[in-house]
Structure formats: structure tokens, C-alpha cells
């Protein structure tokens, strides 16, 4: 369906009490405006015109990669004025969809319904029934059809009783919309050019106005302050959780789950409370994610258990692995099948081979570890000399004793043993035992220091 979209995003957002433009505040880890842009892109919008004003430099920096035409509204003179700034870009015969950068949950299904409902030469208008319509423009009907919209400040006491409200979202043909916008005036309580006045202009020309309701009322709720943003966050997360439950993912507490990206799950996955998913995450079959974990841009294969409070970012984890609790896998970390990392272990840009283990208090950076190797508690790969990074290579069936420092670049061949407390600076041959401790001394009669009085 051929259409273009105008997204109004010029408002300052005073009630957010922030130096950041309102539409850049995030919902589910993504700027509100980007939610709307992504929905339009997914529907195949030919053009997306983003009308901006306050914080323009910040807007353009944050959304630099988005496929939008930037339209400046230098003075905020109302919604009609905002849309009119983009009107020179409208094609006369295309459908033009008007959306809002601070209404992030509008769904593709609702937009499709609205586009389909537009009468020839007329307007399709998204309206919603509200028990408490305070602050919203009211829909005025005459013997059924919509004939006008009256803003809250312009409404009579009788009109204020109307529960059908304007969402501001509409579809009109480009040529008609340009003509109606050109005829707007600002003779109202706000001294602004209201987009809503195009409804009366269309009616005066005998054009039909078709009202459409959203699939869910929450879709058309806007954000003016942080409390409203928090409400939409929870509503969005609830919808995400419901979809995952319907797909067979066991969320132990759907109310305490946050999806801030994309999640693909195999069969019989289980996710405990307070887990946060960011970026693109893939879970295989029978994966268990413990409470309080954060997963970002990672892949976790079948039958792996991630114990509570682990952080995995930019990493790949094989089958039958165990991670955590309190493990951090940083970008470039790779765990091969049946490997294990435990509490307070950090892995960065390192590969842990099949069947290998680092169960306690360890840092593995810029390292390659073979199969069936055991890394003792307190082991550190010393990969950085203050200027450059160096690699540690550890072979198969190696045993590294506790509290060892492996000063890279260094290679430990298959079957070698590193004694506890070793500071290793030279390569180790296959099967060798290395111990670098000083000779043990015993001092009899030694007295501990005492505090001076």
C-alpha cells in the first residue's frame, strides 16, 4: 500500500524535566520515536518525514541511521503547523499518515486498519473511547458521521461529556491534506494551528470522515511525563511477556521480566524473575536462565544453565554448559560444549574449550583454552601491559593451580601442570610441571605489630 508517514516530534517535553528531547527517552531500551519509525518501516512506508524542533542536534545524532526526512519546525505553533512543514514533500495522490513520536505503542495492525478505512477523498481518523476523557479533543458527530473535533479548552460543558476522543492519528490524501492545512487559522484559545481543524474542513467540502478504533486502547496513550512513560513500559513488557508465554517460554514471573530487544527461544526454555534481555538474544532448547541475569546480543545453545545474576554480552555459549552464578561473559567470549564458568569469573575475547572449567574467581582475557582443562580459583591472564594486549594459549588437559598469574604472551602446551601461586612468564612444554613459589620460611617467636598508644 502506497503511503508516507509524518511523525511529529518537535515538542520539548517540559514535564519530563530533562535536557533530552522527549521522544528520545527510551521505552524497552529504544527511543520512543524509533518505535514509531520502525513500525512505519515495517509497513513499507515510502517516505517518513520526522518533524523536529527542540534538541535538533541531539535528535539527529541519536537517530542518524534512521531512514527519515528531517523537517524542522523552528517555532512550535501547533500540530497543524507541524504537519504543514512537511506538506511540500507530500505527493498529491499518496496516502499521508500522521503519527506522533511520543505515542510509541501504535501497532502495525491498527495502522493497516486505518489506511484501509480511508474513504475516497476523505479522512480516516483514529479515535478511542475513554471513561475519563479529560484533556482530549472530543469527537463531534452529526447523525452518525464525524463532523468536527473540539479541543478540551474550546469545548462546551455538554461537549466535555463526550467520551469518544481524538488520538491525533489520521490518514488523508496528500493533495487534500495540503489544501486543508493551507486554510487553517489560529483563532482559538491556544493561538495555535490545530491539525484537528482539517476534520471540519473536510466535512465542509462534503468529504467523509471515517472513525477507526485502535486494536488496544493502550496503543494511543501518549507520554508527557516519566510516570506515563513508566506505565507504558510496563504495558509493553506485559504484552511481550504474554507473547512469549503463548510461544511456550516459561516465564516464572511475567510481571518481572524485561525484553529490550529481540528474543528467539527454542523448546522448553525457562526464564526466572528479573531477567533483562537486550539486543538480539537466541536461546536453544531446554535453556534455563536464573533470576537477575542480563543477556545482551548473545547466543546460548541447548541444555545450558545460566545461574542467577550472570551478565552475558556479545558472547556465544555452547550446549550443556553451566554459567554462574555471578559470571560475566564479555564481548568475544566463547564457551564450547560442556564447559563451565562459575562465580565471579570474567571472560573477555577468550575461548573456553569443550569440557574445560573455570569455576571460581578468575579473569580470562584474550585467551584460547583447549579441552578438558581446569583453571583454578584466582587465576588471572595478565593480558595488558599498559599499552598493548597479548594472548594466552592454554592447551588440552592442562591443570592451572589456584592463584596463578599467566603473563601474556605465553603458551602452555597439552598436559602441563601449573602449581598454585605461580607467576608464569615463559612458555611451558607438554607435560611439564611449573612452580615459581619462593622457598617456604618459618619464623619462630615472631610478634605481630601492635598499635602505638
Curated annotation (Swiss-Prot):
<feature type="binding site">
    <location>
        <position position="330"/>
    </location>
    <ligand>
        <name>UDP-N-acetyl-alpha-D-glucosamine</name>
    </ligand>
</feature>
<keyword id="KW-0808">Transferase</keyword>
<feature type="binding site">
    <location>
        <position position="363"/>
    </location>
    <ligand>
        <name>UDP-N-acetyl-alpha-D-glucosamine</name>
    </ligand>
</feature>
<dbReference type="InterPro" id="IPR038009">
    <property type="entry name" value="GlmU_C_LbH"/>
</dbReference>
<feature type="region of interest" description="Pyrophosphorylase">
    <location>
        <begin position="1"/>
        <end position="226"/>
    </location>
</feature>
<dbReference type="InterPro" id="IPR005882">
    <property type="entry name" value="Bifunctional_GlmU"/>
</dbReference>
<feature type="binding site">
    <location>
        <begin position="78"/>
        <end position="79"/>
    </location>
    <ligand>
        <name>UDP-N-acetyl-alpha-D-glucosamine</name>
    </ligand>
</feature>
<dbReference type="GO" id="GO:0019134">
    <property type="term" value="F:glucosamine-1-phosphate N-acetyltransferase activity"/>
</dbReference>
<feature type="binding site">
    <location>
        <position position="73"/>
    </location>
    <ligand>
        <name>UDP-N-acetyl-alpha-D-glucosamine</name>
    </ligand>
</feature>
<comment type="pathway">
    <text>Nucleotide-sugar biosynthesis; UDP-N-acetyl-alpha-D-glucosamine biosynthesis; UDP-N-acetyl-alpha-D-glucosamine from N-acetyl-alpha-D-glucosamine 1-phosphate: step 1/1.</text>
</comment>
<dbReference type="GO" id="GO:0016020">
    <property type="term" value="C:membrane"/>
</dbReference>
<dbReference type="InterPro" id="IPR050065">
    <property type="entry name" value="GlmU-like"/>
</dbReference>
<dbReference type="GO" id="GO:0006048">
    <property type="term" value="P:UDP-N-acetylglucosamine biosynthetic process"/>
</dbReference>
<feature type="active site" description="Proton acceptor">
    <location>
        <position position="360"/>
    </location>
</feature>
<dbReference type="GO" id="GO:0000287">
    <property type="term" value="F:magnesium ion binding"/>
</dbReference>
<dbReference type="GO" id="GO:0005737">
    <property type="term" value="C:cytoplasm"/>
</dbReference>
<dbReference type="GO" id="GO:0009245">
    <property type="term" value="P:lipid A biosynthetic process"/>
</dbReference>
<comment type="pathway">
    <text>Nucleotide-sugar biosynthesis; UDP-N-acetyl-alpha-D-glucosamine biosynthesis; N-acetyl-alpha-D-glucosamine 1-phosphate from alpha-D-glucosamine 6-phosphate (route II): step 2/2.</text>
</comment>
<keyword id="KW-0511">Multifunctional enzyme</keyword>
<feature type="binding site">
    <location>
        <begin position="8"/>
        <end position="11"/>
    </location>
    <ligand>
        <name>UDP-N-acetyl-alpha-D-glucosamine</name>
    </ligand>
</feature>
<comment type="similarity">
    <text>In the C-terminal section; belongs to the transferase hexapeptide repeat family.</text>
</comment>
<dbReference type="GO" id="GO:0009252">
    <property type="term" value="P:peptidoglycan biosynthetic process"/>
</dbReference>
<feature type="binding site">
    <location>
        <position position="437"/>
    </location>
    <ligand>
        <name>acetyl-CoA</name>
    </ligand>
</feature>
<keyword id="KW-0012">Acyltransferase</keyword>
<keyword id="KW-0479">Metal-binding</keyword>
<keyword id="KW-0963">Cytoplasm</keyword>
<feature type="binding site">
    <location>
        <position position="374"/>
    </location>
    <ligand>
        <name>UDP-N-acetyl-alpha-D-glucosamine</name>
    </ligand>
</feature>
<dbReference type="GO" id="GO:0008360">
    <property type="term" value="P:regulation of cell shape"/>
</dbReference>
<dbReference type="InterPro" id="IPR025877">
    <property type="entry name" value="MobA-like_NTP_Trfase"/>
</dbReference>
<feature type="binding site">
    <location>
        <position position="348"/>
    </location>
    <ligand>
        <name>UDP-N-acetyl-alpha-D-glucosamine</name>
    </ligand>
</feature>
<keyword id="KW-0548">Nucleotidyltransferase</keyword>
<feature type="binding site">
    <location>
        <position position="420"/>
    </location>
    <ligand>
        <name>acetyl-CoA</name>
    </ligand>
</feature>
<dbReference type="GO" id="GO:0003977">
    <property type="term" value="F:UDP-N-acetylglucosamine diphosphorylase activity"/>
</dbReference>
<dbReference type="Pfam" id="PF12804">
    <property type="entry name" value="NTP_transf_3"/>
</dbReference>
<dbReference type="GO" id="GO:0071555">
    <property type="term" value="P:cell wall organization"/>
</dbReference>
<dbReference type="Pfam" id="PF00132">
    <property type="entry name" value="Hexapep"/>
</dbReference>
<feature type="binding site">
    <location>
        <begin position="100"/>
        <end position="102"/>
    </location>
    <ligand>
        <name>UDP-N-acetyl-alpha-D-glucosamine</name>
    </ligand>
</feature>
<keyword id="KW-0961">Cell wall biogenesis/degradation</keyword>
<feature type="binding site">
    <location>
        <position position="102"/>
    </location>
    <ligand>
        <name>Mg(2+)</name>
    </ligand>
</feature>
<dbReference type="InterPro" id="IPR001451">
    <property type="entry name" value="Hexapep"/>
</dbReference>
<dbReference type="InterPro" id="IPR011004">
    <property type="entry name" value="Trimer_LpxA-like_sf"/>
</dbReference>
<dbReference type="InterPro" id="IPR018357">
    <property type="entry name" value="Hexapep_transf_CS"/>
</dbReference>
